[in-house]
A protein has these predicted regions:
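Terminal amphipathic alpha-helical/low-complexity segments used for targeting or macromolecular assembly
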Residues: 1-75, 180-182
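Left-handed beta-helix
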Residues: 75, 80, 85-87, 91-92, ...
Length: 182
């Protein structure tokens, strides 16, 4: 939860370094012409919205809420404020729905969904989780740290730390975690 300008600056610097954007890519992202620029623009606005929301800056949080929602509708990325901790890396522009808690240094591909099930309790994921393309995490489950969720996997039960899961429903396929994926 970002509650100070110093912390906001630190989080933005960490996340900015993962995209390695040039000035021209950042500018092109403002006009929707650079994929990494678009992602960074969305992420930058989301983090500033979180900061202003957490500090009860009503006018600024309303402005950033509008800016984040505008990009969400345009590109299909819907991440709730304070849902993802620092170090989030979004790989591609596309449908992303996060309505749960995700720890530090997560990697998120397109068509990823973290949603509550019928009980409407959101999933909780640990640090350093890799979400493959089209992965879905449903219900009030817990995903441990250092976990890879394979492409198209549907996770419906708790996942222990340091493993890779895949399939429908997701099952552990190895215990090496993200070492195989990076």
């Amino acid at each position: 939860m970002i509650t100070s300008k110093k912390e906001l600056k630190r989080v933005l610097e960490i996340e900015s370094n993962s995209y390695q954007l040039s000035i021209s890519q950042r500018i092109l992202g403002l006009f929707g012409l650079s994929e990494r620029g678009i992602i960074w623009n969305y992420q930058n606005r989301l983090r500033k919205y979180e900061y202003h929301l957490n500090c009860n800056h009503r006018v600024r949080s309303t402005i950033y809420h509008f800016l984040v929602n505008r990009l969400s509708f345009r590109y299909g990325m819907a991440i709730e404020p304070n849902a993802v901790d620092e170090g989030m890396h979004i790989c591609h522009v596309g449908k992303i729905l996060i309505r749960g808690k995700v720890g530090k240094y997560s990697t998120i591909h397109i068509h990823v969904s973290l949603v509550g099930g019928a009980c409407d309790i959101a999933p909780v994921c640990g640090d350093n989780v890799y979400f493959g393309i089209g992965s879905t995490i449903v219900g009030g489950i817990k995903v441990g740290s250092n976990v890879c969720i394979g492409a198209g996997a549907v996770v419906t039960s708790d996942v222990e730390s340091n493993c890779t899961v895949a399939g429908v429903p997701a099952k552990i396929i190895n215990r090496r975690g993200p070492l195989d994926w990076h």
